[in-house]
């Protein structure tokens, strides 16, 4: 209620503190005086939050590490990225509220439902804002953002994961019929590309020798979704593995049997409350009771998802012979599953560089790179774009014989392009991300926007 806020501020009885950029914008737009929670955190605390999140996502290594394993794949590891997406913004709010409470411990607090859960662990003198409003529990991978481009306009919309998978399964009926590996002999060796974008890698696919022995395995994304992806697959003659190629009665039974054990495994892995309360803490404040319910729900959801994916991947590696497997990440759930199972089948795995990485020697950067899977851990070799990244890999302990410099397959086709008559400027920048504590600050968000605006102003006048 903005009018109530304005009146309270005028009476000097309210201090308004925002915890997100949207609220900050709304209050600014209505000229309502407020503070931002970022002002209660210094740089060291933000860096500590980031470091702590990287540590906490490895919780499964500390207590009963084998309890969450299924066919040699640890389900706790598969949810590290998604758990980090949740933890970083949560910890930032948690620490900020601790600091605010330390300054105003005798105050009466009012907070939104998510923040109320934190404040009530510190004081009983707190009430909920919008108490009757419904809050939907949603995790990062519960929905999928679908990008669309119409002429020169780009936009995106969100689909629930379940709806997305239903649409994907429908489309894969036709994909299996026209591009499935049914003509491939099961003992004929092939190369497996995992979660590859056929548009981005179309030149690589079309120029590869024996492209018919290349198989694409995309579980998170559709392999064909528009005319460009269709043409890329058709031109390359590579094969696409879908659920319709692998599913049978035995596989269905294995999945159901695996899913039946989830409840017991989750309960057992989270049975040591004393450990969990001590482990999930920061600055001597435990937050386990705040996240316990959400965390259990997340673990159950992802355990069920993972069992299905592990069984499907196992069937794939049993049905076909692969001379090698190529992944562009070791942290994606599909990639982790395939890489772990490949070890059992003695199939070599190659990690392909997929982006420009920060290569400074700062501790925080190195920690981030390791978390994001920049360096091969389970892969046998890595392919990098050039000698800069090769040196970066060498400095971080990767053996030279395990590094190949082969350039960037994204841009192979650009060499033969004529220079365009119309000048274009490509602004290749990534904005602030929710899994980085410093990126979540209002200062970083506004600085990023101001920088882009300034670049546009300057380049427009060139």
Regions found by a protein language model. Give the residues of each.
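Catalytic-core helical/loop segments in enzymes performing group transfer/polymerization on anionic/lipid-linked
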Residues: 1-462
């Amino acid at each position: 209620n903005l009018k109530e806020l304005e009146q309270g501020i005028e009476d000097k009885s309210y201090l308004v503190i925002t915890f997100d950029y949207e609220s900050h914008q709304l209050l600014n737009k209505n000229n309502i005086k407020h503070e931002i929670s970022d002002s209660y955190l210094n740089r060291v605390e933000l860096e500590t939050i980031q470091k702590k999140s990287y540590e906490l996502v490895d919780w499964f290594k500390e207590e009963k590490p084998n309890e969450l394993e299924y066919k040699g794949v640890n389900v706790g590891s598969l949810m590290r990225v998604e758990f980090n997406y949740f933890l970083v913004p949560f910890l930032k709010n948690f620490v900020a509220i601790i600091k605010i409470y330390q300054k105003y411990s005798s105050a009466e607090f009012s907070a939104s439902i998510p923040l109320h859960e934190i404040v009530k662990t510190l004081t009983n003198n707190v009430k909920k804002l919008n108490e009757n409003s419904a809050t939907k529990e949603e995790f990062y991978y519960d929905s999928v953002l679908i990008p669309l481009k119409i002429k020169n306009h780009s936009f995106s919309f969100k689909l629930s994961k379940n709806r997305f998978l239903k649409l994907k399964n429908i489309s894969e009926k036709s994909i299996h019929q026209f591009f499935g590996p049914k003509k491939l002999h099961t003992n004929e060796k092939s190369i497996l590309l995992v979660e590859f974008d056929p548009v981005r890698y179309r030149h690589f696919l079309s120029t590869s020798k024996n492209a018919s022995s290349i198989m694409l395995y995309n579980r998170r994304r559709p392999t064909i979704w528009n005319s460009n992806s269709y043409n890329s697959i058709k031109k390359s003659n590579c094969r696409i593995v879908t659920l319709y190629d692998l599913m049978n009665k035995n596989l269905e039974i294995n999945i159901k049997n695996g899913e039946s054990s989830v409840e017991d495994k989750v309960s057992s892995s989270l049975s040591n409350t004393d450990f969990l309360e001590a482990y999930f803490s920061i600055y001597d404040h435990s937050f386990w009771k705040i996240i316990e319910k959400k965390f259990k729900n997340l673990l159950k959801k992802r355990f069920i998802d993972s069992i299905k994916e592990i069984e499907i991947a196992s069937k794939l590696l049993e049905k076909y012979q692969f001379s090698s497997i190529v992944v562009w990440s070791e942290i994606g759930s599909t990639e982790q599953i395939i890489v772990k199972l490949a070890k059992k089948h003695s199939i070599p795995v190659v990690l392909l560089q997929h982006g420009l990485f920060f290569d400074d020697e700062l501790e925080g950067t190195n920690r981030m790179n390791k978390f994001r899977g920049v360096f091969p851990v389970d892969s046998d070799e890595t392919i990098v774009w050039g000698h800069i990244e090769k040196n970066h890999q060498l400095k971080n302990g990767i053996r030279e014989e395990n590094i190949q410099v082969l350039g960037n397959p994204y841009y192979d086709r650009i060499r033969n392009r004529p220079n365009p008559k119309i000048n274009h400027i490509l602004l290749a920048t990534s904005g602030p991300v929710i899994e980085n504590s410093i990126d979540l600050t209002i200062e970083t968000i506004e600085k990023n926007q101001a920088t882009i605006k300034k670049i546009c102003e300057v380049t427009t006048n060139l």
